[in-house]
C-alpha cells in the first residue's frame, strides 16, 4: 500500500467511509486502481448530484472523455448497444455507443449539455428515444458483481454509489497532469489535497465489500433490520 495514501487519508475502511460521506454530500472522490493495472486515478461524481461546475472540472482537469457508469439493467432499459460486438481492449472496458440528450442541448459538448445528457439518461422513467446516438457522453456498463467480478473503475463507481445509498450511477474521467500525462496515485493525492477530495483505491472497495458481506453472513437477522 502507498504509505502517503495511508498517512494522508487513513486506513482502507476509513478511506471508503470518507468517500461515501463525500458522495452523499454531493462531493467528488478520487479512485486509483492497481499499479499493475491502469495505474490511474479517476475523478468520480454521483450522477444524481452532478452539477455543471463538477462537469467543467472533469473536462478541464481530466482526459475529457467523460463516462457515465451504468448498471446492466439501465443499459438494457435504454436499449444501448455495446460500442463493438467483440471487445478486444486490454481491460475489457464495456463502452456502449455514446449518447446525447435529444432536447435541451445545443452542440452537446458543453458542461451544461453533458450534464443534461447524464440527467436524461439516469432518470427513473428515461426512455431510449430520449437519447440520440452518437453523442458526447460515453456510457460504461458495470459488471453485475461489481468489483468482486471486475476490479475496474466502472464497477467501483457503481458499487460506491450503492454503498452510499444513492442511485447506482456515477460519472468519471481519468485525472491528467497539466502536461497531458496520466496522474499516478501520488499526483492524485496532491490534486485531492488541493481540492479537498477523499482518495481511495479499487482494492479498498473490494476489501470493504468483502468485509461487509462477511458481517452480513454472520448476522443475517441484524442486517435484515437495516434492509427493511
Curated annotation (Swiss-Prot):
One of its GO terms (molecular function) is magnesium ion binding. Signal peptide: none annotated. InterPro entries: DHBP_synth_RibB-like_a/b_dom (IPR017945), DHBP_synthase_RibB (IPR000422). Mg(2+) 1 binds at residue 38. It is an enzyme of class 4 (lyase). The record marks 136, 174 as: Essential for catalytic activity. It catalyses: D-ribulose 5-phosphate = (2S)-2-hydroxy-3-oxobutyl phosphate + formate + H(+). D-ribulose 5-phosphate binds at residues 37-38, 42, 150-154, 174. The keyword RNA-binding does not apply. PANTHER family: 3,4-DIHYDROXY-2-BUTANONE 4-PHOSPHATE SYNTHASE, GTP CYCLOHYDROLASE II-RELATED. Catalyzes the conversion of D-ribulose 5-phosphate to formate and 3,4-dihydroxy-2-butanone 4-phosphate. Homodimer. NCBIfam families: ribB (TIGR00506). Belongs to the DHBP synthase family. This is 3,4-dihydroxy-2-butanone 4-phosphate synthase. The lineage of its organism: Bacteria, Pseudomonadati, Chlorobiota, Chlorobiia, Chlorobiales. The gene is ribB.
